[in-house]
UniProtKB/Swiss-Prot annotation:
GO MF, one example: ubiquitin-like ligase-substrate adaptor activity
Organism: Bos taurus
Functional note: Substrate-recognition component of a cullin-5-RING E3 ubiquitin-protein ligase complex (ECS complex, also named CRL5 complex), which mediates the ubiquitination and subsequent proteasomal degradation of target proteins, such as BIK, DIRAS2 and RPN1. The ECS(ASB11) complex acts as a regulator of the endoplasmic reticulum unfolded protein response by mediating ubiquitination and degradation of BIK.
Domain of life: Eukaryota
Repeat region (ANK), residues: 64-93, 97-126, 130-159, 162-191, 195-224, 227-256
Pathway annotation from the record: Protein modification; protein ubiquitination
GO cellular component: Cul5-RING ubiquitin ligase complex; endoplasmic reticulum
The protein, known as: Ankyrin repeat and SOCS box protein 11
Localization: Endoplasmic reticulum
Entry keyword annotation includes Ribosomal protein: no
Main location: endoplasmic reticulum
Family per record: Belongs to the ankyrin SOCS box (ASB) family.
Amino acid sequence: MEDGSVSYGFKNIFITMFATFFFFKLLIKVFLALLTHFYIVKGNRKEAARIAEEIFGEISDCWADRSPLHEAAAQGRLLALKTLIAQGVNVNLVTINRVSSLHEACLGGHVACAKALLENGAHVNGVTVHGATPLFNACCSGSAACVNVLLEFGAKAQLEVHLASPIHEAVKRGNRECMEILLANNVNIDQEVPHLGTPLYAACTYQRLDCVKKLLELGANVNHGQWLDTPLHAAAKQNSVEIIHLLIDYGANLKCKNAQGQSALDLAAPKSSVEQALLLREGPPALSQLCRLCVRKCLGRNCHKTIHKLYLPDPLEKFLLYQ
């Protein structure tokens, strides 16, 4: 009986200690949250972000300091947005994560709101803590109109490697029109980013057939992917036979090996349609195909523009242009 009382006493002590620890931990988090709010009110967002990181372990998508301007831009309420601007609201207010109203407008594809913000001095190349620019958000939403407006106001189409890449985002989501606008503004068609590879590699990974076609047509390097992995390697892991044939037609090398020493055929699922397509194309290409690849290589990346200047018979010109 006495042993039971001792055991019960220890149990109560343990529960009390645990409850006290939990209470103090909760109290500290509440205090830090209040301190974060204080710094936001005072305008010291950098310190607020640091404290938020202490609370959450990483800077999370905390929207506690979203302004009415952010809400108006996100919802595409142009009249409300213009009213707030007329009242003197700063168009470059940002959240803890450095998300501006322009980021919100572009993510929602609200071109009228984006233009109003830009006309009133919004930073066109503002970067969030996650490396996203308004142009990246516009490509994410697939708004070609927003992309055009941003470029008109001086948005950088080609960004540093450590920032989120607009062209890769456009390709990932199959937003071909946004991709074409960026390429027309001198974005490197073979830009490689560490986690996505080149735009062509990304298009093959996400099976965006339209983007694959256009990138190849515009002269993307068919064998440049992600380090030693080629676009054909990426396509072989998926199930699009049409992309496999497209890549090989444009000169993809079936014998290329990745870092693990694997060819595209090694990566294809056994007895799949992709494996069959690769096996069928393993042999030597036709002489006409070799000639086409040779002519296009001699003319360079802009062959789609220069072939017309050769004044070739129409059927031959169409063959060289894969039409």
